[in-house]
């Protein structure tokens, strides 16, 4: 599958333990706010495929724990994959997000030293415009809510940053997350959050 063409696009939203804005979002060489950076990237796929395997409407969450300087590597990471995904769809998602299919995750995979066994779980995804939410019952819940800009109408945004997974415009947000997975147990409240529309190919 790694030699097959693929594309994927949709919504990406994140929350981590840093205060807004996470220093590592500007550069992995920056030092994060605490002794470790813990958080997630959550994805709702609008459209995507790996060869003839369609990925439309599926969700995946990447939960991570990294040292204070993310560029130093030694991340621990796990995938939560939507239980609606068939086995070929799960294989395709793992291929993309592990970096084995090329694309942006091939870069991020170099920082991961401990990839844990994927969890296949029920997911509930909600998008109400300025607020994005994903729930895995009894295990994981995250919400990010956009920060209003100075004009009182549009959201505050970041743009023209070098970032391999986000789209060109990142909406600033406050996030909250509760994770009670057996290997990740943390609670975040009003910390760094972002969301954007992503598009990748490989």
Where are these regions (language model features)?
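N-terminal ordered "arm"
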Residues: 2-48
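Short, well-ordered strand-loop elements centered on a beta-strand within folded domains, enriched
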Residues: 7, 32-39, 53, 71-80, ...
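N-terminal start-of-chain detector that recognizes signal peptides
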Residues: 12-17, 32-33, 49-54, 105-107, ...
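Short, solvent-exposed secondary-structure capping/transition elements
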Residues: 26-31, 52-55, 90
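Short, positively charged
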Residues: 37-61, 175-177
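Internal, well-folded beta-alpha domain core
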Residues: 57-202
């Amino acid at each position: 599958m790694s030699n097959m063409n693929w594309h994927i696009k949709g919504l990406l939203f994140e929350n981590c333990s840093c205060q807004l804005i996470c220093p590592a979002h500007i550069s992995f060489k920056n030092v994060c706010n605490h002794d470790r950076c813990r958080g997630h990237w959550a994805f709702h796929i609008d459209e995507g495929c790996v060869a003839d395997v369609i990925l439309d409407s599926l969700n995946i969450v990447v939960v991570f724990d990294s040292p204070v300087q993310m560029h130093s590597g030694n991340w621990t990471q796990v995938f939560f994959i939507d239980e609606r995904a068939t086995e070929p769809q799960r294989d395709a998602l793992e291929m993309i997000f592990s970096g084995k299919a090329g694309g942006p995750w091939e870069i991020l995979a170099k920082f991961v030293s401990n990839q844990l066994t994927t969890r296949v779980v029920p997911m509930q995804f909600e998008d109400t415009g300025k607020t994005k939410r994903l729930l895995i019952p009894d295990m994981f819940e995250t919400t990010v809510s956009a920060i209003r800009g100075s004009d009182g109408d549009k959201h505050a945004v970041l743009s023209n940053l070098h970032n391999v997974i986000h789209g060109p415009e990142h909406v600033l947000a406050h996030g909250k997350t509760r994770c009670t997975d057996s290997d990740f147990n943390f609670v975040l409240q009003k910390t760094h959050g972002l969301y954007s529309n992503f598009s990748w190919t490989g």
